[in-house]
């Protein structure tokens, strides 16, 4: 039997899933990674540690009996987007990887936005608004503050592209990742605004060739085969940005399909035939499917809200008990709202000063109501992202949070959409494996996926529909409060001695 391997390079975890030729998952392996976060906005990853984690999960897959009895036909990759991953000619890191959540470039961003019409031109060209997460702005920061690091590098990569280079020895960028802030969405060429107005054209020698997601991108090297036990010369596909790979993996491949990834970032996407600005806070990336783009609303923090809840409110790591507690609370959580902005927000509105918080607590508020309010706050954020789009229809849910049936029902009730979910939730890895199969011409159409549907309950939806305007008004009215808070804290932080 033929097998396909999907590798997903996440922000806090790397995973590999082995699929048979019917795209049934046969084996999986995962390793946690340790991003480094600092108070000054730096968010970085030790690239060598990440590589060792990838090797470890590949060794586990190689030992699986099913693979030893069959043939590994091809490998595909998906990975976290944005960021800057620099290497030398041999693939050795030049400094740590800069992550999408890094905000060190905020002051330079403010300088650029003071140029008349710059953000309008930037959005028209790249399909995204200027934000600190953007690779283009992170490169701009490096050019200003660490030019020696750029001079020492031979290649610029995104996370999964660097891992693929280490696997194959073939340097390449890939279309979906590059479309996030470097490409002109209409022409597919490098953005003239980024290259000329930001002065990054001098960095073009660092950019490897650009490949389509399902293009062949080399084969597994003898050295990596020896380190992992996987067969040498196995074809490796270019792969895709994780949010695009997840769309492919869950079945959001047709115009109008909507999906949400309940992961580190709660990211909602709408598949379009071309950039269609329905909500001004959107950003566009190229889909894995030819001729399509995805209108994205990636929140700054998704499931970390649930992590915070378990650590500080629930005081219980058992998600099953938490689900049972919130299932017993009426929709609306007794009028308590949670604003899910733990680390600022980037979509469906932009505010680096935004912060999370409860609203509406009374002497009668219970712990269970606080707990349910956090889940509802993230569901309201999905409603917020979908303003202006047709109501009803289906909403594909994927990511680690999609394992919670209670949360999926809350989302169905809150959005008024039929939530479509799969018991198998590693759908970004599944998308990567599908791209691998396409790269060796072994797949004519996307294989079906067993799915469960959660229907919105009319009474619960009516209650949430009445509460959503309060949620929206609250975050709009809080914008100046968040800004005032940040301004008040700045002199205090300057007085603190290291």
Regions found by a protein language model. Name each.
Residues 5-6, 113-126, 137-172, 181-197, ...:
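Active-site core segments that coordinate phosphate-bearing ligands/cofactors
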Residues 31, 98-105, 178-179, 264-266, ...:
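Short, acidic/turn-prone active-site loops that include or flank metal/cofactor-
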Residues 1-96, 124, 152, 225-226, ...:
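N-terminal glycine/serine-rich phosphate-binding loop of ATP-dependent small-molecule kinases
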Residues 205-215, 323-326:
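Short linear loop/turn motifs
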